[in-house]
């Protein structure tokens, strides 16, 4: 998968349209780089986070060592926030380290009880100083500060596409993006037969899930617009991502990992450095 400039005025217009859409979604939560202050709680069982609103299912357990989180509606952004990463640290210096824990959003916390994030038990314990995890868990919620950070996966772990079970080859294709790196949002997805310039747009179903009822014949390549703040660009595969006979329920490697960090045009909402 490569990053390229658009080759025609028509393509440029499409990019502009989707960048504007992406800006609207991103502006809901303000500046990603800002340090925010709130409370964070935790869930004793990670099952709810694995089976959360983002629809990752059992695959969520492979995200970030199981350090997962449910996010408030403002951070979840109607599903656009699925897969986003946040660095979270509690403000009790006796119990918690200054490093905190990095979490991946897999669910929405609809009833937040004034908490912006509800962490998995493993992530909550990871905020603690050595030997203090048990004591930290006796407090169901703590004051925290957090900010969005780039997602980083192990070397060799690329952006991947899961073909959802509701897909019906060859025309009805529903996919879900997994392991998205960087600090951007995917705001547009196109699919085409490998070697063809006849791209078909896909519609966002919810969060990381996209679909089309007019999938072209395989093998298939994809291109996406990644954006956040005011910056956006196409990222796409030069070769095959899904084979000619793709299969529902399988995960396919996109052959690339996104490492971009979105540029923002907003005034810093917090001048305190993250130390």
From Swiss-Prot:
Family to which this protein belongs: Belongs to the expansin family. Expansin-like A subfamily.
Main location: secreted
Gene transcribed to yield this protein: EXLA2
TM segment ranges: none
Keywords linked to the UniProt accession: Glycoprotein, Secreted, Signal
Localization terms from the record: Secreted
Expansin-like EG45 domain segment(s): 51-156
UniProt name for this protein: Expansin-like A2
GO cellular component, one term: extracellular region
Signal peptide segment: 1-30
Induction or repression: Down-regulated by gibberellin (GA3).
Lineage of the organism: Eukaryota, Viridiplantae, Streptophyta, Embryophyta, Tracheophyta
Top-level lineage group: Eukaryota
Natural source organism: Oryza sativa subsp. japonica
Segments forming domain Expansin-like CBD: 171-254
PROSITE patterns reported in the protein's UniProt record: EXPANSIN_CBD, EXPANSIN_EG45
């Amino acid at each position: 998968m490569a990053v390229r400039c658009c080759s025609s005025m028509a393509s440029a217009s499409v990019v502009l349209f989707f960048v504007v859409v992406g800006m609207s979604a991103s502006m809901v939560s303000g500046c990603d780089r800002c340090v925010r202050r709130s409370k964070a709680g935790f869930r004793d069982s990670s099952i709810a986070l694995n089976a959360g609103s983002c629809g990752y299912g059992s695959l969520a357990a492979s995200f970030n060592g199981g350090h997962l989180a449910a996010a408030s509606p403002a951070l979840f952004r109607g599903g656009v926030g699925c897969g986003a990463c946040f660095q979270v640290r509690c403000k009790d210096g006796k119990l918690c380290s200054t490093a905190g824990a990095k979490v991946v959003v897999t669910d929405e916390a609809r009833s937040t009880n004034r908490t912006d994030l509800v962490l998995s038990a493993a992530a909550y314990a990871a905020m603690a100083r050595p030997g203090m995890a048990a004591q930290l868990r006796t407090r169901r919620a703590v004051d925290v500060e957090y900010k969005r950070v780039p997602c980083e996966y192990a070397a060799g772990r690329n952006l991947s596409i899961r073909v959802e079970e509701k897909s019906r080859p060859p025309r009805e294709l529903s996919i879900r993006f997994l392991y998205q790196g960087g600090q951007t949002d995917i705001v547009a997805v196109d699919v085409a037969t490998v070697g063809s310039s006849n791209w078909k747009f896909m519609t966002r179903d919810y969060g990381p899930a996209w679909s089309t009822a007019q999938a072209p014949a395989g093998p298939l390549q994809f291109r996406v617009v990644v954006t956040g703040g005011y910056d956006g660009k196409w990222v796409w595969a030069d070769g095959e991502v899904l084979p000619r006979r793709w299969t529902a329920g399988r995960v396919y490697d996109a052959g690339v990992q996104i490492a971009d960090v979105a540029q923002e045009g907003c005034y810093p909402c917090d001048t305190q450095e993250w130390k």
